[in-house]
């Protein structure tokens, strides 16, 4: 059985994007994302897929949830439902859910783990948000705090959660 993991960077007001772009540039967060997801399945919505600057993420099996699978081309696997996406991924030991909002909302009910980057600021201009999480259902496995520096304009924390049994 695969582990279903949500991966996301979010601001204090749960902001995750504006006009289909990230709100910040945190190189260490991008490096962590790449290290965790490389070699695994990544599941995302169509808008998230379309926002990727280079299209499908390399060295990962890209699954896109969309009601228009015929429009997705050959760089990814198009699935109509989360259930179908998970069936396509069942051979992988860990499946990463990488957004957007609706996909995260659906995944919260079934996820085993969350890898969240908590960015210590708010973005009032955001138009895309991570769903509300009932953190009482989650146990913190690890926390790694990072101050702002010359490459990272905001302080942030990498927090790994696992669902309480």
Per-range role (PLM):
Residues 1-6:
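Extreme N-terminal starter segment of soluble prokaryotic enzymes
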Residues 8-41, 46-165:
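Flexible, gly/pro- and Lys/Arg-enriched active-site loops
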């Amino acid at each position: 059985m695969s582990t279903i993991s949500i991966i996301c960077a979010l601001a204090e007001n749960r902001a995750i994007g504006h006009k289909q772009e990230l709100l910040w540039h945190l190189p260490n967060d991008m490096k962590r994302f790449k290290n965790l997801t490389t070699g695994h399945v990544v599941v995302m919505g169509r808008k998230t897929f379309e926002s990727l600057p280079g299209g499908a993420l390399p060295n990962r099996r890209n699954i896109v949830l969309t009601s228009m699978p015929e429009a997705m081309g050959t760089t990814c696997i198009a699935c109509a439902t989360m259930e179908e996406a998970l069936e396509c991924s069942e051979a992988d030991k860990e499946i990463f859910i990488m957004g957007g909002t609706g996909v995260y909302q659906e995944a919260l009910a079934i996820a085993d783990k969350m890898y969240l980057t908590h960015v210590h600021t708010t973005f009032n201009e955001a138009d895309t948000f991570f769903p509300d999480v009932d953190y009482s259902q989650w146990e913190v496995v690890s926390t790694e705090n990072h101050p702002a520096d010359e490459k990272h304009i905001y302080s942030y924390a990498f927090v790994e959660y696992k669902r309480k049994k």
